[in-house]
Amino acid sequence: MNIGYASKTLGLPEGRMRSLAMRNASDERLAEAIGANLSALEAVIRYCGANGIRLFRVGSDVIPFGSSPANRLDWAHAFGERLAAIGALAARNQVRLSMHPGQYTVLNSPDDDVVRRAVADLAYHAAFLDALGTGAEAKVVLHVGGAYGDKEAALERFVARCRELDASVRRRLVAENDDRLFTAEDALAASEACGIPMVLDVLHHRLNRGPGGRDGLELLDAAARTWGPQDGPQKVHYAQQAPGRRPGSHADTIGLDGFLAFAASLEGRAPDVMLEVKDKNVSALKCLNALDAHGTTAMLERAWAAYKYSVLEHGQAAYQQVRNLLKDKAAYPVREFYRLVDGALARPAPPGSARNAAQHVWGYVSGAASARERASFARLMERYEGGQADLVAVKRHLARLAGRYGQEYLLHSYYFDL
């Protein structure tokens, strides 16, 4: 089973995308932002390849204002060689790329202006994947859209407009079910009518099955038949419901018990699974580790190196429990490891524990820090302990120092992101 995640990579500062305000969208500023974002995408692809992550969803803003008149830059020409090199990098690292336009890209709207913008946005997404040189397996995922008081007519509009799209767009388009309006059966019917694949969103199907909706495996197999050889392996979206939030809200992290039950329920099927989760690559690595039948303690120790100061922030007890767990080098206690880590991170961070973790992190930079920087950190900690500064300010300050003094171990941990 191939597993991936969307858009943002935690613990990888070189993978952060740059944004740009529309008022600043000059050709020069756009070129700078695009260049920086392509560097970030290269870093993410290398990260995915090195960690066995085979799917990555590229954020729509990789080319700022890609489908807007605000971007007058011929980016596909200006960055053509570099884009092709990135596509080749993804191929070498066996990373399947995709994109997912946002909620305002609505192909079935009754408003012609909204549709015009949606068509332009889909064309931009397809053009970006074309510029990378990817095949038709690199998909653009789209929800059916709104119901506008007449769901059947709205579904018919989606099909009609999908058929009118340029072939370069249609060969990449995939229809997805949503959590409120269009069920998996609706999305499947639309995909079959359009001649495009359908991606099954597992959480959305659980929340919005609809009357007469088939069960998971039967529906999964029906969706699989919409994927042709040119489309690559079938894809599904997997998320878990966030406790205490509105239905459809994605959880902060993937719980292993639920994920492993889902994997077992596939009964040997191995679709590509895109995780939709707040902690992104963190959950992707967790799920890959849990599925690895030949996992080692060394793998968990690498994971622990990224987690440990985040766990320490939430309490000394869990931190020590994990350290003790990893002493047996012959074992692979992957489920217990993540039970302890996830349990710690789910609890509020006591101020004393957060202070202790911050002091540990400070220890990496204190020797190189100037007298002024040491005094500044001491004042900040006094303000934190007195309630005049929050933990976010403390961690932001430490992140700046870690970057200034090249503390890669810290920068590539989750401490500044979780």
Where do the protein language model's features map onto the residues?
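Eukaryote-skewed repeat-based solenoidal scaffolds used as protein-protein interaction platforms
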Residues: Y124-A193, L203
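Alpha/beta catalytic barrel-like cores
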Residues: M1-V95, T105-V119, A127-T134, E164, ...
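Short hydrophobic/aromatic-enriched beta-strand-loop microsegments
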Residues: G195-V202, D292-A298
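Short active-site loop/helix that positions an aromatic residue
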Residues: R206-G210
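Short, structured loop/turn "capping" segments at alpha-beta junctions
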Residues: A136-E137, M198-L200, G232
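Residue-level marker for buried hydrophobic side chains located in beta-strands
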Residues: L97, L173, M198-D201
